[in-house]
Structure formats: C-alpha cells, structure tokens
C-alpha cells in the first residue's frame, strides 16, 4: 500500500483518482507522496519513506527543491492546469486598470443613500472615464502556459501583442499565435507597450527584475500587471514609479504591506488560480503525476529532476530507478554491476543540471544486495525498486 498525505485541502476531483493501491493518511511520516498547494515546506524534515511531492499549482517557492533533489525526492508541479483561470484574471486586471471600475464601484457605495443617485451618477461618471484596450499594445514577459494564453486572448480583444521569452520551449512556442510579435530584447517591451504582464518563475535571475532601471525604460503611464510572484517586482522602485506617474497603475495578485501603501495600485488577495475548475485541474494533474512516478518510475513535469519516461513496466519484467548526482556518478558504474548479473536490461537516463535520473527495466528481479551495491556508489542519492 502506498500512502499519500495532503498538506492542504486537495480537490476530491484529484484524490478520487487514487487507485486501490493508494490510501490517504494523516501520518506524514508514513507517506510515500505528499500533495501540497501553498503550505510552507522550506523548513520541513522529510521521512525516508517520502518519494515525491506534487504541487497542485505552478509555483514551487514553498518547497526546498535542491534539498529534495539531494534526498532523492522528486518534486512535481502542474504547469498549465490553472492557465485559463490566471489568464481570465489578467484580462480582468487590464480592464480594472483602464475603465475606472474600482473607483466607480466605491463612488456608488459611498452615495448609496442618495435618493437621486441616478441623476448624480450621470454628473459624477466623468471622473471615472477610462480608455479602451483595443488597439493598445500588450507586452507579455514569459510565454509559458499562462503567458501564451494571455497573449492569444489579447489578440482576440484587438490588442497588439509583443512577447519576450528567451527560454521558451518548442511546445510552448507552437501554442503562441503567429500574430504575436516575438522580441529578443526585453527593453523593447518596456519602451513600446501600454500594458505589460509578467509570467515567469521567481528564481535567482528574475527576482527583483522589475527594478528602477526597468521602470525608467517604460512608457509614461504604463499599466503593469503581476500575477506571477510578488518578488519579481522591486517594491520601492514600483512605489516610486507610481508616485511619479511613470507607471499609471500596478495590478498585482499579491498583497503585501509595501504594496498596500502604494498609490494607484489595484491589489487582489492571490485569486489567480482560485477557481473550482483550476483547483480541480491542478489536483487531477498532481495525482496522476504522483502515481505514475510511484508506480512506473516515470517523471513528467518535475522541477528538480529531468523528464524521464519508460512507460508501464511490461508483465514479467522488473524495474529500478536510480537518482544520482551526475557530477559524481556515471551510469557506466551501474552497468558494470548489472552486466554480469542480468542477461538483458534497458536503460533510460537523463540529466538536469547536476541531478540525474535513470530508469532501468530488467528481465530479472535484482536481489537486495545488488541494489545496495548501486546505492553505495559515490553520488547515488537513492536507488528504488519500482517493480
């Protein structure tokens, strides 16, 4: 029996997919897999039973990825599962920033007792006059699952769209409509766009990237939208740009004390993926990834190990997985152990940065002492009998 622990409430649309070989448990120490949304895991100590963590969502800055990798724990996320939900809120954010909607709603609430509010509103509405987004230029920084959907939807609303992503995958690039203008210099986005939305992960190269220098390059009165991570934007730089009018409005899904003090900021309480559909999609995807890894050893959508797939282990065959440091361990050392023992085996071996993963399907079931010999090799994080 495999045990799964949920650190957050996970949609039953996902947990109902668990087969009879799986059982939910409140005992995290016994769990082979953990399902998580936003719970903080950075300071957690992990049991030796734990094989994998699946994040029902895209962001993984609540999980210690490198430490997990070194402990042989594969971390998954669910890219694209919440893309439509976030896309819709980005479009909403552009409209909120453009049409005086927030101020108009507040005015109506403040004047709710006015018996002649209909006539008064006709006089007051001019202070909330806005601009249409049709014909304006949107810059999309990051053309992954969410960025691609935002770019395509903006085209449908009559906007000109520019996209920047030096790391875009081939699969992601195919999802972006040809009318999206790809640029190779981020400064072009800053200089030419009326609206800018950012959709990149918070990593060492992107944290604080929207700084004073970036804001200085932007068009006067630009609307900047951040539905990715709060740390991408340097708060003092954004506050200064808003105060000067360089940035006309900052729309963010991340409420912080610094942002709440900014003028002309529209702040939402992290609603990007907060829809029933997104939560269901993320939960289903996370559970499928977790089971496929535990049952078959396949890795799809990991954020700390390479993708590696060998399908379902055929009847009558056996399979082991080796998680290792590719700087210290070469798979030749493993084959040297296996070749005198096993008549035939097939290996799929991939690396991601310094972390490697090998799936080995064999005609014979290996004795425990053979697995122990592999596990004792320098650089081996974990050797697991999959089947």
Predicted region positions:
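Oxidoreductase and adenylate-handling cofactor-binding alpha/beta cores
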Residues: 87-106, 152-159, 285-298, 335
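Glycine-rich Rossmann-fold phosphate-binding loop(s) that bind the pyrophosphate
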Residues: 143-144
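NAD(P)-dependent dehydrogenase/reductase Rossmann-like domain
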Residues: 271-387
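N-terminal Rossmann-fold NAD(P) dinucleotide-binding loop
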Residues: 147-148
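Phosphate-binding beta-alpha-beta segment of Rossmann-like dinucleotide-binding domains, i.e.
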Residues: 79-137, 301-302
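Rossmann-like adenosine-cofactor binding region
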Residues: 42-44, 166-259, 274
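An N-terminal-biased, well-structured beta-alpha scaffold segment characteristic
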Residues: 1-78, 211, 217, 234, ...
């Amino acid at each position: 029996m495999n045990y799964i622990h949920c650190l957050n409430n996970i949609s039953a649309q996902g947990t109902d997919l668990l087969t009879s070989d799986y059982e939910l448990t409140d005992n995290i120490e016994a769990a082979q897999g953990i399902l998580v949304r936003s719970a903080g895991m950075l300071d957690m100590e992990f049991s030796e039973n734990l094989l994998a963590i699946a994040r029902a969502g895209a962001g993984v800055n609540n999980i210690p990825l490198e430490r997990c990798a070194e402990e042989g724990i594969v971390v998954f996320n669910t890219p694209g599962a919440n893309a439509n939900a976030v896309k819709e809120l980005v479009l909403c954010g552009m409209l909120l920033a453009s049409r005086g909607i927030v101020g108009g709603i507040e005015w109506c609430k403040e004047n709710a007792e006015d018996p002649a509010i209909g006539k008064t509103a006709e006089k007051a509405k001019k202070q909330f006059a806005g601009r249409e987004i049709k014909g304006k230029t949107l810059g999309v920084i990051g053309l992954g699952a969410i960025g691609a959907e935002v770019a395509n939807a903006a085209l449908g609303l009559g906007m000109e769209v520019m996209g920047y992503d030096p790391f875009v995958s081939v699969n992601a690039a195919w999802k972006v409509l040809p009318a999206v203008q790809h640029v190779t210099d981020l400064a072009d986005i800053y200089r030419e766009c009326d609206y800018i939305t950012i959709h990149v992960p918070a990593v060492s190269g992107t944290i604080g990237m929207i700084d004073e220098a970036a804001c200085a390059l932007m068009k006067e009165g630009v609307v900047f939208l951040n539905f990715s991570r709060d740390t991408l934007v340097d708060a003092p730089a954004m506050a200064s740009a808003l105060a000067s009018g360089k940035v006309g409005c900052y729309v963010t899904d991340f409420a912080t004390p610094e942002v709440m003090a900014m003028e002309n900021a529209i702040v939402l309480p992290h609603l990007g993926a907060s829809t029933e559909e997104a939560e269901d999609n993320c939960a289903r995807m996370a559970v499928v990834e977790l089971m496929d890894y535990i049952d078959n050893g396949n890795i799809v959508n990991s954020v700390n190990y390479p993708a590696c797939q060998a399908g379902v282990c055929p009847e009558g065959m056996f399979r082991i997985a080796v998680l290792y440091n590719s700087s210290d361990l070469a798979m030749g050392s493993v084959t040297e152990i296996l070749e005198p023992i096993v008549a035939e085996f097939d290996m799929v071996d991939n690396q991601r940065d310094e972390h490697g993963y090998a799936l080995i399907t064999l005609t014979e079931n290996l004795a425990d002492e053979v697995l122990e010999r592999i596990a004792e090799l320098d650089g081996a994080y974990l050797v697991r009998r999959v089947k």
